[in-house]
């Protein structure tokens, strides 16, 4: 699924003409016939729901009989992994004037349709919507969500600047909510280019939705299933949104959208929280116990801040998005990590939570950073596309967050609290997005940091802590903001796995080398059913496991039951006890007035 993917922008294929000693020659670049009047139609109703599928049609006009080459994206921006959505396509067909057209495939996600002349052509297929993932599509008996990257084809080699119209067919009484711009008819939408049409996740079916104006922007909150997020819980989410959004807009001096839509799915079985950002919306899938939980607020804040940082303020390597291949960048720690810094900070600045919430979240990021060992932020940013198995596949989130935190303190200290990381974000946002959408380079990032820091060089910081692998200088930097880090050592029983959660439970994504699970034969891909007497289905289950075995000696035998394919497998493990260092970020009672001023400005803006 994450294998190297050939560039569909270049479209260069090697002709395998090696018979008789012939030398392989490159073929011409893939290029579709020109298309006009592109319309998409999406169907989700009771009939398609029975097969957990979404019906898709694409109609367009051709000028002649030249072949039309249509490609489906391989990934959704923000996910940084190749999902190859073409594998979920079934029943592909093409027709014109009521007659079937010939078609074949050029590669595994590009279809070649052969029109018989000028006129309207319609291609259709069914998309299997059974993947509970924020970058994919998922359906139940009366509800579905989809991402445009899953459903909408584009003409290969013709650029992505074409406008389009989207029509959604569904049952009478079922709702549609999306960030797309409404068209002239009900359930009809328009998009200025392909980037826009695929960046608008959509709910169809039965769900709750309401709206409010926040800081001059219409905000919609859509939640599935009906009735789950109601009353005080829904009011809490709205209060949090009212607090966080103005605090974010203040960093950039504007809200870049006319409307914003928060889409939330709470399945019956889901073990955590997963969300994905878009230009004027985001889609999240959550454990039901997280309704109105502070963790939910943190995730929502993260995705909303992305509407500025990465959807608009974006590394140059990601401008424009190329939907057919990976786009690695060394700057993902800025796009994701610094967003992780601002998400919790915005909740404090917006009055949603007290500073202690930010301290606790940051202490968790520090612990994750220290536990990961020596890994450079730039290296981790590049490696995310291959998902390293050493536990560092997402380290650029917490380590990038604390890098942003330290930079903010250092900029404030260098300028006597006259400037901050806010100035860096605002400067780059306006120069590399608003004035001309070029994206920012590494050089532009550090030049902006230098300017904000009053000309102070941050070359040493970059060399040691971003490109380098040195431990972060907590004891040198935190006191500048009247803060200090305290540690405590505990000993905890661990199973020895890295879990990921979905609607089936806790799946083993990787194993701790030489850990108890690896030694007993647990395999990547297994689903944990039970560990000792503890039923495992979500993150809280592991807290129960640790509590149950807290007083047991190392080496105590216990059984683990895993689901492996269609079979349940019982394995015998020996208890392993691991030393854990707990870290807390606290205010220094002996801090200077200058340090307190920096801390207060950081926490409350300014």
What is each model feature region?
Residues 7-20:
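Bacterial N-terminal signal peptides
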Residues 39, 53-57, 67-69, 110, ...:
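Intrinsic-disorder/low-complexity, polar/charged segments enriched in Ser/Thr/Lys/Arg/Asp/Glu/Gln
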Residues 26-75:
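Early extracytoplasmic/domain-onset interaction patches
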């Amino acid at each position: 699924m994450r294998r190297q993917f050939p560039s569909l922008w270049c479209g260069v294929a090697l002709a395998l003409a090696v018979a008789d000693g012939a030398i392989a020659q490159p073929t011409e670049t893939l290029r579709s016939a020109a298309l006009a009047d592109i319309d998409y139609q999406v169907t989700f109703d009771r009939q398609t729901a029975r097969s957990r599928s979404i019906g898709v049609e694409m109609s367009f006009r051709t000028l002649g009989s030249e072949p039309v080459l249509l490609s489906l994206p391989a990934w959704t921006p923000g996910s940084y992994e190749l999902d190859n959505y073409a594998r979920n396509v079934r029943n592909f067909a093409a027709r014109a004037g009521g007659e079937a057209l010939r078609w074949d495939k050029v590669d595994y996600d590009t279809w070649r349709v052969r029109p018989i002349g000028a006129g309207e052509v319609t291609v259709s297929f069914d998309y299997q919507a059974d993947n509970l993932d924020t970058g994919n599509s998922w359906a139940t008996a009366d509800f579905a969500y989809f991402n445009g990257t899953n459903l909408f084809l584009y003409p290969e080699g013709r650029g992505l600047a074409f406008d389009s119209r989207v029509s959604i067919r569904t049952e009478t009484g079922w709702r549609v909510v999306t960030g797309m711009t409404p068209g002239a008819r009900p359930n009809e939408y328009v998009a200025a280019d392909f980037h826009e049409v695929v960046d608008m996740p959509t709910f169809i079916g039965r769900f709750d939705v309401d709206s409010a104006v926040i800081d001059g922007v219409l905000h919609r909150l859509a939640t599935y299933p009906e009735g789950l997020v109601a009353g005080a819980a829904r009011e809490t989410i709205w209060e949090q949104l009212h607090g966080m959004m103005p605090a974010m807009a203040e960093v950039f001096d504007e809200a870049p959208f006319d409307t914003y839509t928060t889409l939330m799915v709470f399945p019956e079985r889901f073990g955590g929280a997963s969300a994905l950002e878009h230009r004027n919306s985001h889609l999240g899938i959550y454990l039901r116990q997280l309704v109105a939980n502070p963790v939910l607020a943190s995730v929502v804040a993260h995705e909303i801040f992305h509407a500025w940082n990465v959807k608009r303020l974006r590394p140059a390597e990601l401008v424009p998005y190329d939907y057919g291949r990976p786009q690695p960048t060394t700057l993902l720690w800025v796009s994701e990590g610094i967003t992780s810094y601002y998400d919790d900070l915005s909740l404090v600045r917006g009055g949603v939570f007290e500073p202690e919430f930010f301290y606790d979240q940051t202490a968790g990021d520090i612990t994750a950073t220290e536990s990961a060992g020596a890994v450079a932020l730039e290296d981790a940013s590049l490696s995310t596309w291959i998902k390293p198995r050493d536990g560092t596949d997402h380290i650029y989130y917490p380590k990038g967050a604390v890098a942003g935190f330290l930079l903010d303190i250092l900029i404030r200290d260098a300028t006597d609290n006259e400037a901050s990381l806010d100035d860096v974000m605002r400067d780059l946002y306006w120069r590399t997005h608003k004035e001309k959408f070029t994206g920012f380079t590494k050089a532009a990032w550090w030049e902006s940091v230098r300017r904000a820091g009053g000309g102070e060089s941050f070359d040493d910081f970059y060399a040691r802590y971003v490109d380098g692998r040195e431990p972060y200088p907590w004891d040198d930097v935190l006191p500048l903001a009247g803060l200090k880090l305290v540690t405590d050592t505990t000993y905890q029983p661990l199973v020895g796995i890295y879990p990921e959660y979905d609607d089936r439970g806790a799946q083993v994504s990787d194993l701790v080398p030489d850990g108890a699970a690896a030694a007993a034969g647990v395999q990547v891909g297994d689903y944990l059913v039970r560990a000792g007497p503890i039923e495992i289905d979500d993150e809280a289950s592991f807290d129960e496991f640790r509590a149950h075995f807290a007083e047991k000696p190392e080496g105590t035998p216990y059984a683990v039951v895993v689901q492996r394919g269609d079979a349940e497998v019982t394995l015998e493990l020996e208890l392993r006890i691991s030393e854990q260092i707990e870290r807390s970020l606290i205010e220094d009672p002996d801090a200077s007035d200058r340090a307190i001023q920096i801390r207060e400005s950081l926490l409350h803006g300014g």
